[in-house]
Amino acid sequence: RASRNLPAILLASQLRPGFYGFLLRAGVDLPFSADHYGLSLVLGGAEVSMRELGGLYAMLANKGVWRHPRLYEGEAAGSAVPLLSPEAAVVTLRMLEDDAHFVRSKEGPVPLRFKTGTSNGFRDAWTAGVVGPYVLVVWVGNFDNTPNPLLVGGDVAAPLFTDIAQALASDAGPLDDLG
């Protein structure tokens, strides 16, 4: 699959209000000003936690409505913050879908909607996405931040993401799809 970085930069340059404000409304902690990040923000130019990243994917799965991410059942979800139209959320998830990537559940194939990433200098490899009602974020790296040329998201984090998604699909009942 070809990278979609250039269209993402073009789109971000046209957003009003900007992507920086969108991320702030989605609970992402950005310690510097919008000018500090510029358009690099759309390509991962700021550090985000796994919880923040998961919250963004959950917002897509919730048809554009963001809530503080819950890590366990029973944790308060907080108030709803509409950030995208339902149509924009569904279109975005469908852009992340690939016919070749799905898991099998008792109800049949379930598409995986995900994005991989590799940090500058090969310090982090990650995959984040949605499978049925679940949001998964997988990070692979060294806790001391040392680089490793093998830390490529599509090579090391994506297979783990797929394995976890398959385990969830095998253990769960029907995995609801986007209606």
Regions found by a protein language model. Give the residues of each.
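A penicillin-recognizing enzyme superfamily signal
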Residues: R1, S49-G179
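Active-site-adjacent helix/loop patches that line small-molecule binding or acyl-intermediate pockets
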Residues: R1-L30, A34-N62
